[in-house]
């Protein structure tokens, strides 16, 4: 039985990866172009006037945050669009009636989202080499933060797709929630520059912890304790996973 589940998981993974690789011009190229513009405008043009941040050039400071921004956006978008398309076309019903556990279905779609997020992250990192020298303080923290964040936002995208009723619904969360939280997550500034009240308020933003942990992996500096960073990631992943499992298990919004 486990072999059957493994075959099902690999099949979903392969389908999801083939889906975004087949249209790479729409899924991989646009975020790379967008991040390149960020590097040029914020890093080169504005960064040269700002000066150093925690002993690093402004460009070096924002690179980890921009990479994380690309991973968050693309992990989320991949699963949200893919799962909702399967639901809209009623392909998901074939999975629901097949002898495949809900855990395998979730892992398959999330695996596709993580793969796209990591692909975009690697491409953006490669582009950043044209602007700043490559520096890594801890590969372990870079890999852990990147993978856990990609998993979290893939689950968030899945959750959005389960509740969505139209294609417009899957763009509401990225526009009105994800984008503001990302911009206010410390990508372009350090929390230490904020007044005490706004520092405290910023700690309610989960993206702050992810960017801080990822920046530590690259530069060795962080705004929040590392234990807290991984604690927040694990708690959110567990909560989102259980919620997704419960909704799909009950067929919420999936069965006609």
Q: Where is each model-derived feature located?
A:
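Aromatic- and glycine-rich beta-strand/loop motifs that create alpha-glucan
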Residues: 1-32
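Membrane-interfacial helix-loop-helix junctions in multi-pass membrane proteins
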Residues: 20, 182-239
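Hydrophobic alpha-helical transmembrane segments of multi-pass membrane transport/permease proteins
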Residues: 22-48, 61-73, 179, 232-239
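Short alpha-helical transmembrane interface motifs in multi-pass membrane proteins
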Residues: 26, 61-65, 72-77, 107-109, ...
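Pore- or pathway-lining transmembrane helices of multi-pass membrane proteins that form conduits
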Residues: 29-33, 166-185
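Hydrophobic alpha-helical transmembrane segments of multi-pass membrane transport proteins
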Residues: 33-38, 58-128, 157, 175-176, ...
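Alpha-helical transmembrane segments and their short interhelical loops
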Residues: 102-174, 221-245
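Short cytosolic juxtamembrane segments of multi-pass membrane proteins
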Residues: 248-256
């Amino acid at each position: 039985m486990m072999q059957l589940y493994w075959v099902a998981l690999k099949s979903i993974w392969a389908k999801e990866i083939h889906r975004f690789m087949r249209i790479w011009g729409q899924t991989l190229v646009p975020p790379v172009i967008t991040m390149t513009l960020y590097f040029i405008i914020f890093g080169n043009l504005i960064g040269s006037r700002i000066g150093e941040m925690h002993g690093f050039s402004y460009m070096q400071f924002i690179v980890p945050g921009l990479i994380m921004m690309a991973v968050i956006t693309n992990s989320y978008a991949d699963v949200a669009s893919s799962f909702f398309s399967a639901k809209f076309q009623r392909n998901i019903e074939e999975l629901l009636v097949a002898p495949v556990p809900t855990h395998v279905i979730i892992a398959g779609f999330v695996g596709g989202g993580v793969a796209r997020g990591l692909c975009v992250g690697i491409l953006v990192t490669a582009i950043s080499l044209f602007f700043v020298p490559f520096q890594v303080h801890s590969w372990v923290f870079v890999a852990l933060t990147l993978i856990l964040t990609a998993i979290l936002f893939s689950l968030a995208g899945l959750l959005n797709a389960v509740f969505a009723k139209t294609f417009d619904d899957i763009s509401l969360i990225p526009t009105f929630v994800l984008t503001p939280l990302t911009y206010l997550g410390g990508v372009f500034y350090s929390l230490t520059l904020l007044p005490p009240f706004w520092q405290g308020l910023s700690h309610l933003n989960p993206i702050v912890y992810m960017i801080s942990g990822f920046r530590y992996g690259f530069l060795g500096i962080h705004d929040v304790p590392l234990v807290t960073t991984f604690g927040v990631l694990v708690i959110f992943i567990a909560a989102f996973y259980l919620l997704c499992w419960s909704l799909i298990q009950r067929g919420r919004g999936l069965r006609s």
